[in-house]
A protein has these predicted regions:
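Structured interaction patches on ligand/partner-binding surfaces of diverse proteins
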Residues: 61, 140-179
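Acidic, low-complexity Ser/Thr/Gly/Pro-rich repeat segments typical of extracellular/periplasmic
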Residues: 1-121, 125-128, 133-137, 151, ...
Length: 184
């Protein structure tokens, strides 16, 4: 096996401050997480095509690895669709970010607690979440820093409880500096 674009494609949730490292030796893949793990927490590692088979370099899609630092795996789920209101098309390159904080400025100051990406139809899904309330934000993260910056597309923050299918599409819209200063 081999890997490509690990820092771009690999997602660990809850998110880590330091990028994880994938090490390949023959047919063995080792994942090293550099941050301290939280107690009693389920972690999801989504490979998103960053691992390729050795024969034809085909990406291994839709592969996730789960583990828990507690006695059980969390089972909460959350799913929905994201649409770019500027084009009226599904957002196929959006982050969907969950925060445990209720602060309005959390999306400009902190990385999300949980992260997933939309597929080509704008669909997203979180699995193995703790059962609780979250603040959900969709973000077209141009500079890939997992925080809202000027001229990126963002949704309004939505308070959501896990184990939900969001019935309405979440729309994202342009974010400009003038609205940024009112949030800080």
């Amino acid at each position: 096996i081999t890997t490509i674009k690990v820092n771009e494609l690999l997602i660990v949730s809850p998110t880590q401050n330091q990028n994880p490292v994938l090490d390949v030796k023959g047919k063995e893949l080792t994942l090293s997480l550099k941050d301290t793990l939280l107690p009693n927490t389920t972690y999801t590692v989504k490979f998103n095509g960053c691992v390729l088979d050795v024969n034809e370099n085909n990406p291994i899609l839709d592969y996730s690895y789960l583990f828990s630092t507690g006695l059980y795996l969390d089972s909460g789920k959350l799913s929905g669709h994201i649409k770019d209101i500027t084009t009226n098309l599904p957002c196929n390159t959006c982050n969907v970010q969950l925060y445990t904080s209720n602060s309005d400025s959390v999306i400009i100051k902190h990385k999300p607690d949980y992260l997933t990406k939309t597929n080509e139809t704008g669909y997203f899904q979180f699995n193995n979440l703790p059962t609780r309330n979250f603040k959900l934000v969709a973000l077209k993260d141009v500079n890939k820093n997992l925080m809202l910056d000027n001229n990126e597309l963002v949704s309004l923050a939505t308070e959501i409880y896990t184990d939900k299918i969001i019935p309405d599409t979440i729309n994202i819209f342009p974010f400009y500096q003038s609205s940024f200063t009112t949030m800080v």
